[in-house]
């Protein structure tokens, strides 16, 4: 028994790497040997693929249609959508879309269930039979044949040995009738019978194995059809799913499109302005000049011509975004952006840069570069004029409009610091750039050089705008914006900016109103208290130099300054001011300079009074006896000038009509009443004002 097992192990060790065995090789031809080698790989492939396909199934394997659909994730998604759209308005866009999505998910779940059931029937079950039944049966016959052949070979060896032993015993002189000879002969006969029986079994098993191999060869094509059928089932599943999705999407888009074209939605639909070609934009809106160009130019003409660094300083991103949105949605509501010229300039640059094709066109790029490379000014101007004539009509009209505006902007370069060169640097790359080409570093360097030439082209266009684009231009082409002329804007700016801060002009000669009644003593005391409070709170400053201006030119600035220096009125004092001791005396008044008493000469206003908290008194001030004179500090005990308008004896009150007139003049100018009253009163000869001693001012302060 041990010898037989050892012989069996030796036979298994002699089996080739290709699966060939010496027991079966002698019964198979070369073709059947190759078929035999494909049995084990085919069995492993069928088993592994069946296992992975089974894992791809989403439903319950082997269940009927309804149970399988309930277990699918798509059906769970459909159920969730059905529960969700019940809480929404069924007439809303979201409710309709969710309802349609719920229905299509349910349909897709049923298609998936049908796909899985077909896959199980046509692919999974045949692969399972192949890997679990058919191929294992063939391999089982192979193993049986190998065992029978091995046993047959062993039996033949024993028979051969027994026959040899029987012949050797006869050769040694044993009689044929002896017991040992009889026993050996019986053994040989028994082995021959066993060998013949085993040979018959080997031949029978061999025939069965060969039949299995031939059957496998004939069925091998059908086994390959399992995988073809898998792809067909998948294609049919995806085709049905796609058809259902296309139908649902068409219906959903149709319903959603009707909702978009409803009156409420149409009211909020605005045409695109930025990022659209110039010709398309002008055709859609029926304009001659692009809306962003005209709107930004009109706003800049209104507020931004004197803004320093215009087009160079960047604006806030949020303001710029809101301006661009308002430009497309409601161009009539752009007034709020007029106060931010940098945002308006940024919107104009953004529009020019976002054009699909530059305003000066790609086709004429090389022509612009050649014109800019000319050194002689006359030839360059002629070349630029020729290139301009070749522009499309809509590009030419918009370029002419823009260059006229930029030339107007350059006229204010003393204030806004934007020379034609500076304007060309910031706007040139937005008006012309080369077509995009994939290239090496040399082409990139050439592009940077061309940008410098573009700046030269735009600068020449700005400088020669009147020559290249002759004739006047109406910037308010569409009439959509309020026509604000540059001259009005400049005069308004000058009136508000050129405000003298060191002089009070002579009031305009207007008809004087009726003389006011004589003031009561209380106002005089109030004026004196106000003056003393002002002198005690504010330290003295040296007198400012005079600035001589004609009355018509300076009336408006003074009024504007008085308006800007208004402060809350101080509280009225309830008691008279303290009196200065009589030991103090005033020095003699210096002689007046020639021409200082003329009505047309403005008098200096102390700088400390500008921006102070002084307000006009609530009662009319006393009429001054003399025209305005240079402000001089005066002793508190200096005699007051006699006034014909004040009744009664002259009072030694510190509220005299020299310095108090200076104090009240600035305050009264804020109310607009005092200067006119002063100019209409006859001026009798007056005592010159006495300067206030420096020692007295220091003691008082």
From Swiss-Prot:
The gene is SH3BP1. Residues 1-275 are annotated as: Interaction with CGNL1. Residues 276-469 form the Rho-GAP domain. Its main location: other. It comes from Homo sapiens. The modification Phosphothreonine is found at residues 601, 626. Keywords: Cell junction, Cell projection, Cytoplasm, GTPase activation, Nucleus, Phagocytosis, Phosphoprotein, SH3-binding, Tight junction. The lineage of its organism: Eukaryota, Metazoa, Chordata, Craniata, Vertebrata. It holds the Pfam family BAR. Residues 508-522, 570-579, 587-596, 618-630, 641-652, 682-692 have a biased composition (Pro residues). Residues 17-262 form the BAR domain. This is SH3 domain-binding protein 1. One of its GO terms (molecular function) is GTPase activator activity.
């Amino acid at each position: 028994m041990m010898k037989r097992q050892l012989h069996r192990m030796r036979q298994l060790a002699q089996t080739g790497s290709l699966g060939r065995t010496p027991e079966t090789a002698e019964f198979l031809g070369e073709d059947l040997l190759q078929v035999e080698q494909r049995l084990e790989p085919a069995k492993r492939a069928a088993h592994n693929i069946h296992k992975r396909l089974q894992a791809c199934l989403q439903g319950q394997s082997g269940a009927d249609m309804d149970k399988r659909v309930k277990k699918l994730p798509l059906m769970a998604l459909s159920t969730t959508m059905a529960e969700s759209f019940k809480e929404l308005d069924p007439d809303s866009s979201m409710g309709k879309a969710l309802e349609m999505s719920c229905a299509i998910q349910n349909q897709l779940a049923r298609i998936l269930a049908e796909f899985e059931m077909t896959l199980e029937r046509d692919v999974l079950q045949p692969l399972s039979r192949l890997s679990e039944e058919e191929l294992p049966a063939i391999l089982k016959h192979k193993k049986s044949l190998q065992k029978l052949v091995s046993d047959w070979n062993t039996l033949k060896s024993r028979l051969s040995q027994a026959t040899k032993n029987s012949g050797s015993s006869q050769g040694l002189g044993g009689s044929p009738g002896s017991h040992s000879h009889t026993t050996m002969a019986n053994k040989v006969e028994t082995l021959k019978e066993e060998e013949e029986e085993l040979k018959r079994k080997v031949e029978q098993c061999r025939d069965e194995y060969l039949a299995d191999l031939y059957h496998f060869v004939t069925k091998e094509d059908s086994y390959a059809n399992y995988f073809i059928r898998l792809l067909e089932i998948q294609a049919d599943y995806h085709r049905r799913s796609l058809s259902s999705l296309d139908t649902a999407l068409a219906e959903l888009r149709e319903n959603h499109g009707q909702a978009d074209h409803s009156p409420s939605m149409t009211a909020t639909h605005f045409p695109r302005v930025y990022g659209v070609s110039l010709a398309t934009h002008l055709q859609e809106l029926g304009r001659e000049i692009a809306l962003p160009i005209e709107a930004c130019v009109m706003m800049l003409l209104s507020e931004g011509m004197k803004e320093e660094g215009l087009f160079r300083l960047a604006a806030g991103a949020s303001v710029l975004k809101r301006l661009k949105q308002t430009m497309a949605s409601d161009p009539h509501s752009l007034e709020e952006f007029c106060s931010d010229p940098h945002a308006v300039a940024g919107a104009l640059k953004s529009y020019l840069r976002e054009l699909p094709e530059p305003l000066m066109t790609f086709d004429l790029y090389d022509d612009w570069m050649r014109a800019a490379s000319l050194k002689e000014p006359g030839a360059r101007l002629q070349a630029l004029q020729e290139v301009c004539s070749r522009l499309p009509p809509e590009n030419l009209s918009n370029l002419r409009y823009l260059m006229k505006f930029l030339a107007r902007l350059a006229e204010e370069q003393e204030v806004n610091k934007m020379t034609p060169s500076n304007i060309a640097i910031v706007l040139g790359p937005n008006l012309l750039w080369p077509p995009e080409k994939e290239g090496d570093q040399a082409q990139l360097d050439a592009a940077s050089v061309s940008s410098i030439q573009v700046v030269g082209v735009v600068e020449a266009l700005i400088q020669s705008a009147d020559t290249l684009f002759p004739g006047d231009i109406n910037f308010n082409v569409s009439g959509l914006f309020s026509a604000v002329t540059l001259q009005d804007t400049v005069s308004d700016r000058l009136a508000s900016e050129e405000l003298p801060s060191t002089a009070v002009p002579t009031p305009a000669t207007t008809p004087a109103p009726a003389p006011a009644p004589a003031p009561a003593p209380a106002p005089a005391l109030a004026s004196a208290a106000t003056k003393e409070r002002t002198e005690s709170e504010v330290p003295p400053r040296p007198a400012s130099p005079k600035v001589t201006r004609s009355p018509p030119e300076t009336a408006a600035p003074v009024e504007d300054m008085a308006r800007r220096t208004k402060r809350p009125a101080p509280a009225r004092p309830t008691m008279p001011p303290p009196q200065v001791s009589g030991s103090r005396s005033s020095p003699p008044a210096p002689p007046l300079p020639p021409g200082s008493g003329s009505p047309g000469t403005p008098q200096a206003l102390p700088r400390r009074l500008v921006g102070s908290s002084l307000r006009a008194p609530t009662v009319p001030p006393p009429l001054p006896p003399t025209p305005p004179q240079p402000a001089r500090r005066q002793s508190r005990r200096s005699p007051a000038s006699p006034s014909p308008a004040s009744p009664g004896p002259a009072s030694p009150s510190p509220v005299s009509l020299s310095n108090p007139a200076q104090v009240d003049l600035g305050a009264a100018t804020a109310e607009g009443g005092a200067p006119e009253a002063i100019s209409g009163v006859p001026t009798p000869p007056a005592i010159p004002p006495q300067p206030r001693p420096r020692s007295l001012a220091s003691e008082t302060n």
